[in-house]
Amino acid sequence: MIVLGVDPGSLKTGYGVVQHHNGSFSVLAAGVIRLQAAWSHPERIGIICRELEQVIAEFQPERVALETAFLSHNVQAALKLGQVRGAVIGLVVRYALPIYEYAPREVKSAITGKGAATKEQVAFMVSRMLSLHTVPKPHDVTDALGIALCDILRGESRQSGVPPRTNSRRKSGTGGSWEQFVRQSPNVVVRS
C-alpha cells in the first residue's frame, strides 16, 4: 500500500509518500513545498496543487491522508489554511483517490502513543518507524510522514475491526491501533 501524507500550509506544505509492505514501512518521497509570502495566495495554492499533482502522478498513491485544520485565533491564517486544504481535497477528488483526515492530536497518538507529544518526539518516532538514519527536516516533512503512517495504522484498524484510538487518555492495552501495530511489526518497533 502507498499513502501520500500532506501537512498543508500556506507558506510551507509538507508531503510524504510511504509504502507499507509485509509489515515494514519505506519512504518513497518526502519534501516541503516552500512558498514566498510575497506571492499572491491564489498563486501559492496553484503551486501547491501542481507540485502535489506531480507527486501523485509519479508515485500513484492508493489514498491520501491530510491533517485537519487547527483552531487559530488569527482568522485570516485559518481562512488561508482552509483554502489550501480545500484545493488539496479538490485535487485528490479529481484523481478519485480516497482521502482521510486526521487531527494533529490523533496523529501524535498513533505515532508516539501520546496525543500531547512534542514535534520532536513525533519526528524521532517517525524516523525510527521508517528506519531513517537522520530525522528529516523541517518538521513539515516529518509531520507529513507521520500523517501517512497514522493513516496506514488507522487503515489496519479499519480493516481488522479494531476501533481507532482517538482518546490519548485511554488505558494502554485496550486494543488500540498502536498496540496492534506493535504486535504486527516487531521489526519496526524499537524496544529498550
UniProtKB/Swiss-Prot annotation:
Which cofactors are named for this entry?
Mg(2+)
Q: InterPro entries, alphabetically?
A: RNaseH-like_sf, RNaseH_sf, X-over_junc_endoDNase_Mg_BS, X-over_junc_endoDNase_RuvC
Q: What are the subcellular locations of this protein?
A: Cytoplasm
Q: Which PROSITE patterns match?
A: RUVC
Q: Where is this region: Disordered?
A: 158-192
One of this protein's GO BP terms? DNA repair
Residues noted as binding Mg(2+) 2 in the record, renumbered to the chain:
67
According to the record, how does the cofactor bind?
Binds 2 Mg(2+) ion per subunit.
* Molecular function terms from GO: crossover junction DNA endonuclease activity; DNA binding; magnesium ion binding
User: One GO term of the cellular component aspect?
Assistant: cytoplasm
Q: What is its EC number?
A: 3.1.21.10
Summarize where Mg(2+) 1 binds, as residue positions.
Answer: 7, 140
Query: Hydrolase: is it a keyword of this entry?
Result: yes
Catalytic reactions of this protein: Endonucleolytic cleavage at a junction such as a reciprocal single-stranded crossover between two homologous DNA duplexes (Holliday junction)
Q: Which UniProt keywords apply?
A: Cytoplasm, DNA damage, DNA recombination, DNA repair, DNA-binding, Endonuclease, Hydrolase, Magnesium, Metal-binding, Nuclease
Q: What does this protein do?
A: The RuvA-RuvB-RuvC complex processes Holliday junction (HJ) DNA during genetic recombination and DNA repair. Endonuclease that resolves HJ intermediates. Cleaves cruciform DNA by making single-stranded nicks across the HJ at symmetrical positions within the homologous arms, yielding a 5'-phosphate and a 3'-hydroxyl group; requires a central core of homology in the junction. The consensus cleavage sequence is 5'-(A/T)TT(C/G)-3'. Cleavage occurs on the 3'-side of the TT dinucleotide at the point of strand exchange.
- Write out the similarity annotation: Belongs to the RuvC family.
The record ties this protein, via HAMAP family, to: RuvC (MF_00034)
| SUBUNIT field | Homodimer which binds Holliday junction (HJ) DNA. The HJ becomes 2-fold symmetrical on binding to RuvC with unstacked arms; it has a different conformation from HJ DNA in complex with RuvA. In the full resolvosome a probable DNA-RuvA(4)-RuvB(12)-RuvC(2) complex forms which resolves the HJ.
- Per its record, how is this protein called by name? Crossover junction endodeoxyribonuclease RuvC
Native species of this protein? Chlorobium chlorochromatii (strain CaD3)
Q: Which gene underlies this protein?
A: ruvC
